[in-house]
Amino acid sequence: MIGTIRIFLVVAAMVALSLSLIPFQYLFLKLKNGWKRRLPNFFHRIVARLFGFRIRTVGKLHEGCPLLLVSNHTSWSDIVVLSAVGQVSFIAKSEVRDWPVFGMFAVLQRTVFVERARRGKTVHQTSEIANRLIAGDAMVLFAEGTTSDGNRVLPFKTALFGAAHAAIREAGVAEVAVQPVAIAYTRVHGMAMGRYFRPLVSWPGDVELMPHLKGILREGAIDVEVRFGEPVFVTAETDRKALARTMENRVRALLQSALLGREIPEA
C-alpha cells in the first residue's frame, strides 16, 4: 500500500514539474539560450530526489576543451543520474526518439540519435556528434551499446569514438578530452545491494520499461555513486580502437572501485 501511494505521489509531482518546465525548454531551444543546457540539469536534480536517488560523486567533469564522456550503462535511470550531476547531452539509439514521453524528453535534452546497425551512416553520425562537441556540449556515449547487469562492463563498441577525431579534423581544435565515467548502484534503503539485488535497478532490453520504472519508484532510497576518471586527451594521431580499449579498462576499474569500496587503479 505504501509503495502504491509513493508511486502516485511521485508521478503526480513529475507531471506537475514537467508541465511547468517543458514550455521553457522549448523556448530556450528556439532562442538558442544558454539555459537549454542548464534547465535539463535543474529538472533532473529534482527528478533524482523524487525517485529517491542519493547520488555521490567522486571526481568531476573535465572543463576547458571539447568533452566526450564515456560511461557504462545499466539502466534508463543512468540518464537521470548523469543529468543531475552535470550539464550533459546523450548519444542514444534512434529507437529512443519514438518512445512515448521518454522520446520527447530525449529530444528536449538535444540527444543525438544514432543507428548503430547502419555502418554506412557512421561518418555522418560521428560528424554530428563532433559538431556538438565543438559547440561546447558535453556528450555522453554509452559505449557498450546496450545495458548490463550493473555488476560488470561489457565490451565497448569503437565506431563512435571517431567523433573525437572528427571534431579535431572539422574544427581544427588541438585536442578533445575523452573522460571515463562509471555509474554504480550500491545500496537500497542503506543496505548493500550486492550482485543478487542489483537487478532491481538494472534494465536489460527484454524487460518492459513501465514495470521496471514502477519497481524503482516503489522502492526509493537508492544510493548511486558516479566516478569520473582522468581524461585522455585525443589528438589527430590517437588510435580510435586503442582509445576505446583504454576507456573500457578505465570504466571497468572505476565501476569495480565503487562496487567494492576500495580503489582499483585505472589502466
Swiss-Prot record:
Function: Catalyzes the second step in the formation of ornithine lipids, which are phosphorus-free membrane lipids. Uses acyl-acyl carrier protein (acyl-AcpP) as an acyl donor and converts lyso-ornithine lipid (LOL) into ornithine lipid (OL).
Signal peptide: none
PANTHER family the UniProt entry points to: LYSOPHOSPHATIDYLCHOLINE ACYLTRANSFERASE, PHOSPHOLIPID ACYLTRANSFERASE
GO cellular component, one term: membrane
Molecular function per GO: acyltransferase activity
Protein's cellular compartments: Membrane
Chief subcellular location: membrane
Bilayer topology annotation: Single-pass membrane protein
Traits of the deletion mutant: Deletion mutant lacks ornithine lipids but synthesizes a component corresponding to the lyso-ornithine lipid precursor. It does not affect resistance to bactericidal peptides or permeability of the outer membrane.
Similarity-based family: Belongs to the 1-acyl-sn-glycerol-3-phosphate acyltransferase family. OlsA subfamily.
Pfam families assigned to the protein according to its UniProt record, in alphabetical order: Acyltransferase
Keyword line: Acyltransferase, Lipid biosynthesis, Lipid metabolism, Membrane, Transferase, Transmembrane, Transmembrane helix
UniProt-listed GO biological process terms: lipid metabolic process
Pathway: Lipid metabolism
Catalytic activity as recorded in UniProt: a lyso-ornithine lipid + a fatty acyl-[ACP] = an N(2)-[(3R)-3-(acyloxy)acyl]-L-ornithine lipid + holo-[ACP]
InterPro entries according to UniProt: Plipid/glycerol_acylTrfase
Organism: Brucella abortus (strain 2308)
Cross-referenced SMART domains: PlsC
The protein's name in its UniProt record: Lyso-ornithine lipid O-acyltransferase
EC number: 2.3.1.270
Transmembrane segment boundaries: 7-27
